[in-house]
Each structure stands twice: as C-alpha cells, then as structure tokens.
Amino acid sequence: MSKGPGPGGSAASSAPPAATAQVLQAQPEKPQHYTYLKEFRTEQCPLFVQHKCTQHRPYTCFHWHFVNQRRRRSIRRRDGTFNYSPDVYCTKYDEATGLCPEGDECPFLHRTTGDTERRYHLRYYKTGICIHETDSKGNCTKNGLHCAFAHGPHDLRSPVYDIRELQAMEALQNGQTTVEGSIEGQSAGAASHAMIEKILSEEPRWQETAYVLGNYKTEPCKKPPRLCRQGYACPYYHNSKDRRRSPRKHKYRSSPCPNVKHGDEWGDPGKCENGDACQYCHTRTEQQFHPEIYKSTKCNDMQQAGSCPRGPFCAFAHIEPPPLSDDVQPSSAVSSPTQPGPVLYMPSAAGDSVPVSPSSPHAPDLSALLCRNSGLGSPSHLCSSPPGPSRKASNLEGLVFPGESSLAPGSYKKAPGFEREDQVGAEYLKNFKCQAKLKPHSLEPRSQEQPLLQPKQDVLGILPVGSPLTSSISSSITSSLAATPPSPAGTNSTPGMNANALPFYPTSDTVESVIESALDDLDLNEFGVAALEKTFDNSAVPHPSSVTIGGSLLQSSAPVNIPGSLGSSASFHSASPSPPVSLSSHFLQQPQGHLSQSENTFLGTSASHGSLGLNGMNSSIWEHFASGSFSPGTSPAFLSGPGAAELARLRQELDEANGTIKQWEESWKQAKQACDAWKKEAEEAGERASAAGAECELAREQRDALELRVKKLQEELERLHTVPEAQTLPAAPDLEALSLSTLYSIQKQLRVHLEQVDKAVFHMQSVKCLKCQEQTRAVLPCQHAVLCELCAEGSECPVCQPSRAHALQS
C-alpha cells in the first residue's frame, strides 16, 4: 500500500542520468492518496446498477455511474512515460457518451465529468494547496471529501514527472537548450513554453494586455488538432467550451449563465437558447478574461514559484508592487503590467485550458490594483498626476468597453481565488501608511511647518467614502475645531469666514492648522481588519440618489464570488475606466441643500490645497463629510443647514429601504419555506394517490373476476333447471289424479333414468370386485379378473370353481 500506482520501478531503456534515474523510482504514497490514485472513479458503482446508490444527486459517489464519468488510472510505464498525457486533451473523445475511438489506449487526456483524469493524475493530484476552507472534519467546504487539492502541508504529495519532463528540467538546470521537436515529444512545460514563444514571435501584440483581453480565445485555431497543444498555450479556441465571445462585439456580464453552468461544472454553451446574445458568461475562459475580473487578483504561481507557465495568457496579475521606502524610484522605472519580462515556463499544476486551481490567485495589493486600473506603474502616479486628459493615457485603456458602467452594483460574484479578510486588511493598512510617503510635495510652496500635513491629507484622499478611518478623522477634526478657543472678531474678516477667526489668519492656514491638529492624533495602527470589513460592506451599498460624477453613473458589476473573501468588493472593482471615486463637490451643489456661508468658505479654501483622491481629481476631506461619512461626534456646526437635513433624510430613506428589503427577504424566505412544504405535501399526496390508484385497480380486477364467476354459476344453474330430471313420484292416490299424458311423460322419464341406472350398474359390476363390490378388480394368477387383491388372498377364483361363483352370485 505504500507504493504509488505507477510501476515505474525500473530505469528507462536508454540509461538516463543519475538524477533522472533516482527520480524515476516509484515514490511512496500515503494510503489515502494511493487509494484515490488507483481506484477513484475507475469502477462502476454496483449500488447504482441496482438503483440503490444514495450519492447520485448530488453526485458524490466514489465510483462512476455513467460512462462519461469513468476515469482511466494514470500509470507511469517502465520507460518513464505516462499511459496518457496529463496536459494534452483528446479531440476524438465524446464528452456526452464517454467513448473514444482509441479506447483506453488513447495517449491523450479525456475530458471526463469533473475533469477527473487530469485532477487525479499522478502529475497533479494533491500537488497544490486548495483555495477553499477546510471544515471540522478536514474536508473541503467546496469540493467535499473528494477534493483533488491538498488541505494542509500533511496532505501534500510530490508530483510524478514524465521522463521527458525530467530531462527538460535537467537540461534547463545545466544551461542547455532543449532540442526542438514535435510538440507531442516535449514535456508539458517545455511544449507550452515553445508554443508561446512561437506565437509571440509571430504576433508581438499578444504581449499587450489590452490585446489579450480583446482577442484571446475569440478566433478558431487553424492548426490541425494533433499539431496544436491547445489549452492556455494557444490563444485560439478549439471547441465550444474553449471559445470566448469578444467583449468588443458582445456585451455580457461576469456572472455564469445558469443554463450552462450547473454547480461547479461548465456545460455545453449550446444549451443556452440565447446563444451569443446571452448576457452571461458561457465558459470559464469568458469569465476569467472578463474586463471586470481580468488581472484583478495575483497569480499564485508567481507568488510561490516566481514563474508562471501561462505567460502573457495568464488571467491573473504578475506584477508585484514596488518596494515601499523613503527613497522611491520614479514612476518611469516601474514596470508596466504589459511589459514583457524573462518568464521561466516551468511545469505547473495549473489548469490546461484556463488558469484554475491550484494556480489560484491571492489577495490583490491595493496600490497595485489602483495602478492597474489607472494605467500607472507606481502609486506615485496616482498622487502626483494632475487631473485631465493625461490620466486617460493608459496602457490598459482598452480593458473596459462601452456599456459596462450600466450594470447593477454588487450584483455579481467575485473572481475565483480572491483574497481573505486578513490579507486584505494587512495590505489595506500598509498602503494607507505608505501613500503619505509616496505623495510628492510639489503642488504648491509650503512652509517648513507643513510637510507633515500633506501626507496626512493624502491619506484622507485615498480613503473610500464611508470608511471608518474617514469617520474617525472627521470626528478628530471636529473635536479640534470645537476645542479651538474663540478669537475676537476683526474688521478685516472676510464675509464668508467664521466670526470667531482672527482677521490676520488666512482661511487656508486656519483650515490646515485644524487638519494638522486632527491628523496628529490619528494612528493608523488603531484600525484593524474588522473596521476595514465594515468599510467594504458600507461601500458596496449604492446611494439612493444615484449621484453622477463626470457624466457616468457610479454603477458596476462586481467580479464573481471567491470563497473566503470579503462580502463585497465594490471598492476594488469597477466597470468604469477610472478607479473608484469619492463624491466630489458636485454633490454639494444640489439645489435642495446648500451649506451655510461659513461652511462654504471652509470648503472652498481647503479645495485650494486639495489632495488627490482615488480618481485623480482635486478633492478634499470635506467631500467625505458631505458624502455622508459623518462621525457620531461631529459638531452641529457642520451639520446645520438644509444640506445636512437632506443628507439625514436620504440616510433615513436608505435605512427604511434596507429595512423594507430585509422584510421582503424574510417574507420571501417564509414563502419559499411554505412553498417547499406545499410541494412536499403535494408529492406525498401524489404518492398516496398513486398507491390508491394501484389498490383501486387491483380491487377492480378482483371484482371483475368475481362477476365472471357469478355469471358462470348462474349459467350452470339455468342449465340445471332446463334439463328434465327424475321427479319424485307422487303417492299412489295422487297418480290417479294426473292426466294420462302426464303419466306417459313420467313413465318415459323414468324409463330413461332406469336405462341410465342399468348402464351404471352394469359398468360398476364389470370393474368392481364380485365379493366386496367396492375395490377394483385385479388380475389373479389364473389370469382371471373378478376379485380384488384383498379378496383374492382369502378366496379362490370363482371362475375356476363355478360352484363358488354361483354361490357368490346368489
């Protein structure tokens, strides 16, 4: 039980190097791993044949039920090669019937249900960590007991390599170049690498991220199936499940189509009646290369191995954020996500047609995400670039296509393999602290006492609307304002200034002194992950007033759901070309509510020093206050006026709407429970009706049988009544009273019956014993048959002795 299923215990026929020969030895396998590698889905379930298997729906049985679920056992032969490739799929395999013209001898991978031949191959089974959580029993919360990925270091196993792959790895380590040959004769990583390099040399535009997003897997492959490696290494599609509709021609959301994807499996896109006009994703390729999800999360291969076998065709981000230090390099020195680099394509357990688990993405860095969305290579661009047309000059400008900003916010799931809360919180706080260092101080001349103020304003500029950090800062600023002692009014004070401000203090200096006092008390370490989670939850709720900024509606569809991720990612993902933006002063200019004159003065003067927000526009911390991120400790001086009343009314309406939605959800749950109960009762009633119908049919058959029997008895009775029978003779005096014809009739009947009686008597005498007249006659030794066996033992034959016969007859 300790040996792997592969028999590769002997060396290859051509003596390989020592390192290769050592690896070719059969590695020990854990008993559970050995069981799955050898027996999982290789035999048909005997209970399913008897219609007794309880693990059919949902299908969690250890054995296969239908032929297209059958898995061939992967074996490494004595020559060091696998019995079928772990990477190249067979083009003749019928996924519906599970049949291949070459049968089990086919050297290519069969795309069985659940892709079990690839996932449970010696090359990939349990070689990567699962991205999903582990329950109390140690099983995967997503894939259950049969998860093909490891849940912990104790569950990991070393991959079994093909001899050609080992030779390619040794040649790569020795600095030798791999001899070019056919794709089928190369290892998985070497063949993919060679094919990608050839494609990039033929079409250099594949190195551009925007070109990949717009054209990857949108055109059919023109090469013969045997000459193309297929999968991720080829940017063209080979079947309907590999095809991707171009987002430039077709507008569809990032959510999977319910008619195509059932559970975790992607079915045939032809099952959707809408075809290419469907508004949802039909393949995994369409979902992972959707503009809302593409490059939104980090590549796990880059983080763990430092290389990715998919190269420019990877749907996940490869660029790490620049090192954060006091001496920041200029933005031009930071590489762009589209710049090609020396990438080593090593064999990986990544998916063949799509980059899936165990090459799962991890948490995206906030600064890297912002730089990616804005098209800049460094966070310094985010803070120092002025607003205007220059912000649109992005290397990812073509990633977002028209019509996507009208999608409903927060209505879709997140990308596969999204980050966990602890990772997001750590990265989020880390970038908050470092943005102040990265912020240049070249907006306008400042005194020596102001350098500390600018980074703190930058921190406020990058905080999302409704963030607990913003609320705490607003509370601190309000407290500082309230703690400032009133100053005597002067004659030179501006009409819009506070009456208590000193006349020789400029308005901007007054506001900056307040901000500096408030931010001195701010410690970013005091804010934990819980506060950030609340920030993300609050930022995902759309504002009921549907405020528009720059003419575009703040609506988007969030990426697909990721196990173990935050509840919402609307702050990180946006369908608009620009990154998420905070509410600008446009919201303050609504005709329903204007702030007081003194507050407008504060807002106007602070805007002159406006720090750049996430959208790159001049904005100040007062915009966060105006957008509804007030702290409970905010001074009433900032909440006075019709604008504050309007905000309070809108907030109340939002709370009421949320309460109504919760009530509707509860009502819907109750109605669903009642509907399920009614459905169950209806099913039970139907079963009872079926049983009653069967009983009724049986009773009807019994009734028909009884009626037939009664009918036969009646016919027999009628026949007996019509047949003339011997009648009992009346008494002698009565005979004289009868007519002569009646007497003749009685006489005739009696003669007939008498003849019948005589015949019966003669027949009985001829077969019965002459002595006892009960037993049947038997043949005596004298060959006479006149007595029975019992009587013949004690009497002599009456025929041989006539006197005896006469005596018997008398």
Curated annotation (Swiss-Prot):
UniProt-listed PROSITE patterns: ZF_C3H1 (PS50103)
Region (Disordered): 1-24, 239-265, 478-497
Residues modified to Phosphoserine: 240, 374, 378, 385, 394, 631
Residue spans of biased composition, Basic residues class: 241-253
Keywords for this protein: Coiled coil, Cytoplasm, Metal-binding, Phosphoprotein, Repeat, Repressor, RNA-binding, Translation regulation, Zinc, Zinc-finger
GO BP terms in the entry: cell morphogenesis involved in neuron differentiation; in utero embryonic development; negative regulation of cytoplasmic translation; neuron migration
InterPro entries for the chain: Unkempt-like (IPR045234), Unkempt_Znf (IPR040594), Znf_CCCH (IPR000571), Znf_CCCH_sf (IPR036855)
Record GO cellular component, one term: cytoplasm
Record field: compositional bias (Low complexity): 10-19
GO molecular function, one term: mRNA CDS binding
Pfam families on file: zf-CCCH, zf-CCCH_11, zf-CCCH_UNK, zf-CCCH_UNK-like_4th, zf_CCCH_5
Localisation per UniProt entry: Cytoplasm
UniProt zinc finger (C3H1-type) residues: 84-113, 124-154, 215-241, 251-285, 293-321
Claim: Phosphoprotein is one of the keywords in the record: yes
Coiled-coil portions: 643-727
Zinc finger (RING-type): 766-801
Role played: Sequence-specific RNA-binding protein which plays an important role in the establishment and maintenance of the early morphology of cortical neurons during embryonic development. Acts as a translation repressor and controls a translationally regulated cell morphology program to ensure proper structuring of the nervous system. Translational control depends on recognition of its binding element within target mRNAs which consists of a mandatory UAG trimer upstream of a U/A-rich motif. Associated with polysomes.
Record-stated family: Belongs to the unkempt family.
Name listed for the protein in its UniProt record: RING finger protein unkempt homolog
Gene for this chain: Unk
